[in-house]
């Protein structure tokens, strides 16, 4: 708390201190740009393990290298989640590692299978039935492969892409088939598994899948039907069906367009690209199907987004601390690195602490005051800000563990049986059981809910005038009787976080015995990954809504900084004009302090009033301190006393009218753009990047110009809807543009 005149706590108006003797500053950084020399020694401990932030930044720069032309290498051991995203969603080129050591493993494992077939040995998947029917025998391995694909092509898909006679309850394609990005990611991951040389397939098969992938031919794969037990059998069968050119298997082909591309039979698509179908040899149908590629694919794509959202949550928390004029002290190293050194908690605290470096709005030091000086004042921030490292930290740890686990899954052999090409041994196991992915997705989805819950709590505090340290109700930039700006967002975010809570429920507790009780336990990994994508969809809505609110709140804080300074100047001018002739300079300063305190108290409790009535009320509250102060003074004569008393009504009138005019002028200047498109920028430091990205790059303006004009031109003529502005932020989050900004903030 800033001290006025050495002894008296300076009043605050709308969460901002009225103190004309000094410029606002924090962390030793003044608005005039001068700052003390920075120390090079970090107060935070150095970790030998990579943090989630490390993974996030590394993945971003790796992803950028793929966008610049570097190929995603398929070698069975180095495929990253960034590589999966780049190839699946952004059409980065892939390259098979055809080095002698890699190809030799594939060739050797294939020779083991060929030798077993030639010798007539009984081997699972070569001469036996599948799963619970493994007690059957056949000496026709090629027909056995056809039978495998046939019984797995059970997905329910639209029979036509033509318009329907009856409007559907839900979109026929999205309700039944996977997005192309999921399928492309699965193709890539399956190639990466097969190239490890443990599945007994030919090199030509891996090349054929790569050729189809490069041609941007994407199988139409059913959204449902996998329990991720013996791998994602049915979804992967559609990739196998495309490889062989099954005319009943359809694919997406043709130029990209808004919405789905053209659906055509796989044989037609292959022919149009000059690609010959590849008949599958013995064991190869099983080699394609028996794996976790779809679970790992959707999990990888989901985690890429989840890591970004976890970083954005910390950015939002830093901005929320500024918008609520909170304190950086909640994130001090002593609290987290010394007293409770959980890795995730330390990471979250360090990141938020660093983001608040150089802030103007948040306090950076603690000043002790006497009990009498801070009656009714919170000595610490509320839980959503103060305990955010403790709340976010475990989520960062869980997402990091999931990230590592799914990365490992993308570089594993998930097949059965497994072939050791060096010894000729065939191993029967269960690497297709995708519980590693399930656990990763369950903890990620729960973490996403907790992140959403924290941001929702911050958001509701920010729009509530009883908790937001002097901001107007619903962050209305104009008179609140005709401006309910964020009320709809407040309701919407409650819907979002409620849905996140529902989605956070575990999927794996619903496992059912399947396939003649052979798959008595299964992972449901793909279902869990799909649910996690749904959570990401919802959380992205909440984050974009909160970012929109944060930018509005920061603009209002900037406006109030000017308003507070102006009100103080008005009070000083009017008091000097009316009372300087009857009181001493020291007495005038003491009187000014009491009047400022009364003005602050009034403004902090009258935010729901329109400006004229609010300023009139503020002015009226100065009567008692003025009267009490003047009656306690020993004035030189009755004339002086009379002058002082009759001047009180004039002071009130002038203060109310001038403060009303000042607030109106500031509102007009801010909403019309006269203060610039990003008026809060001078008050921000590291968080300025995301604020200016929203305001300048995305063109999301401060809200309230329609309200200021009393809707003279109607709705939507001068301003887009609130939802349209939030949609711009949402699109930037989902298409990767915001990710670049987030990385730059932490770099």
Curated annotation (Swiss-Prot):
Catalytic machinery residues: 124 (proton donor/acceptor)
Region forming the signal peptide: none
Oligomeric and partner information: Homotetramer.
Region (Disordered): 1-47
GO MF assignments: phenylalanine ammonia-lyase activity
Residues in cross-link 5-imidazolinone (Ala-Gly): 229-231
Coiled-coil annotated residue ranges, if any: none
An individual GO BP term: cinnamic acid biosynthetic process
Protein induction: Induced by thermal stress.
Post-translational modification: Contains an active site 4-methylidene-imidazol-5-one (MIO), which is formed autocatalytically by cyclization and dehydration of residues Ala-Ser-Gly.
Lyase found in the keyword field: yes
Pfam families from the UniProt entry: Lyase_aromatic
Name the record gives this protein: Phenylalanine ammonia-lyase 2
Polar residues composition-biased segments: 1-20
EC code(s) of this entry: 4.3.1.24
Subcellular locations according to the entry: Cytoplasm
């Amino acid at each position: 708390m800033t001290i006025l005149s050495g002894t008296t706590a300076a009043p605050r108006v709308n969460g901002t201190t009225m103190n004309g003797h000094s410029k606002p500053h924090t962390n030793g950084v003044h608005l005039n740009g001068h700052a003390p020399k920075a120390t090079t020694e970090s107060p935070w401990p150095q970790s030998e393990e990579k943090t989630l932030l490390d993974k996030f930044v590394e993945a971003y720069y790796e992803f950028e290298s793929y966008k610049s032309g570097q190929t995603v290498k398929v070698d069975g051991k180095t495929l990253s989640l960034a590589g999966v995203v780049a190839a699946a969603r952004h059409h980065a080129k892939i390259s098979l590692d055809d080095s002698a050591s890699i190809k030799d493993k594939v060739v050797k494992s294939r020779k083991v299978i060929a030798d077993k077939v030639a010798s007539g040995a009984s081997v699972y998947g070569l001469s036996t039935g599948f799963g619970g029917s493994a007690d059957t025998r056949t000496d026709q391995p090629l027909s056995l492969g056809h039978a495998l694909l046939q019984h797995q092509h059970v997905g329910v898909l639209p029979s036509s892409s033509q318009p329907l006679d009856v409007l559907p309850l839900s979109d026929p394609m999205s309700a039944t088939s996977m997005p192309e990005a999921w399928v492309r990611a699965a193709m890539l991951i399956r190639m990466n598994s097969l190239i490890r040389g443990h599945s007994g397939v030919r090199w030509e098969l891996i090349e054929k899948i790569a050729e189809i992938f490069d041609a941007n031919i994407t199988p139409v794969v059913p959204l449902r039907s996998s329990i991720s037990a013996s791998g994602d059998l049915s979804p992967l069968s559609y990739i196998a069906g495309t490889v062989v050119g099954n005319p009943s298997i359809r694919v997406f082909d043709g130029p990209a367009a808004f919405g789905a591309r053209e659906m055509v039979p796989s044989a037609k698509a292959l022919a149009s690209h000059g690609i010959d179908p590849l008949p599958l040899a013995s064991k190869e149908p099983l080699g394609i199907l028996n794996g976790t590629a779809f679970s790992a694919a959707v999990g990888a794509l989901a985690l890429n987004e989840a890591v970004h959202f976890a970083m954005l949550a910390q950015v939002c928390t830093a901005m929320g601390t500024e918008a609520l004029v909170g304190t950086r002290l909640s994130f001090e190293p002593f609290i987290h690195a010394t007293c409770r050194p959980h890795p995730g908690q330390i990471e979250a605290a360090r990141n938020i602490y660093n983001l608040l470096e150089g802030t103007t709005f948040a306090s950076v030091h603690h000043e002790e005051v006497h009990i009498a000086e801070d009656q009714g004042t919170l000595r610490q921030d509320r839980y959503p800000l103060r305990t955010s490292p403790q709340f976010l930290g475990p989520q960062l740890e869980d997402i990091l563990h999931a990230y590592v686990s799914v990365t490992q899954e993308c570089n594993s052999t998930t097949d059965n049986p497994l072939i050791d090409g060096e010894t000729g041994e065939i191993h029967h196991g269960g690497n297709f059981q995708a519980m590693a992915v399930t656990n990763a997705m369950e903890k990620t989805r729960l973490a996403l809910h907790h992140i959403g819950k924290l941001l929702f709590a911050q958001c509701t505090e920010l729009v509530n005038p009883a908790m937001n340290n002097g901001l107007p109700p619903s962050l209305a930039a104009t008179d609140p009787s005709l401006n309910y700006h964020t009320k709809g967002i407040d309701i919407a975010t409650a819907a979002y976080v409620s849905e996140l809570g529902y989605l956070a429920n575990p999927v794996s507790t619903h496992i059912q015995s399947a396939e003649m009780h052979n798959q008595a336990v299964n992972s449901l990994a793909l279902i869990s990954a799909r649910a996690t994508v749904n959570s990401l969809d919802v959380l992205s809505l909440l984050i974009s809504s909160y970012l929109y609110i944060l930018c509005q709140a920061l603009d209002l804080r900037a406006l109030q900084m000017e308003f507070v300074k102006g009100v103080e100047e008005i009070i000083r001018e009017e008091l000097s004009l009316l009372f300087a002739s009857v009181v001493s300079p020291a007495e005038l300063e003491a009187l000014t302090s009491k009047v400022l305190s009364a003005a602050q108290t009034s403004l902090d409790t009258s935010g729901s009033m329109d400006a004229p009535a609010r300023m009139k009320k503020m002015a009226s509250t100065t009567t008692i301190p003025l009267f009490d102060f003047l009656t306690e003074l020993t004035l030189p004569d009755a004339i002086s006393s009379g002058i002082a008393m009759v001047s009180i009504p004039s002071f009130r009138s002038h203060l109310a009218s001038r403060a009303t005019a000042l607030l109106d002028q500031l509102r007009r200047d801010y909403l019309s753009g006269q203060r610039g498109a990003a008026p809060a920028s001078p008050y921000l430091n590291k968080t300025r990047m995301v604020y200016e990205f929203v305001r300048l790059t995305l063109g999301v303006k401060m809200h309230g110009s329609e309200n200021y004009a009393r809707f003279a031109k109607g709705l939507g003529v001068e301003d887009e809807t609130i939802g349209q502005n939030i949609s711009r932020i949402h699109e930037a989050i989902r298409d990767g543009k915001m990710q670049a900004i987030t990385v730059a903030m932490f770099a």
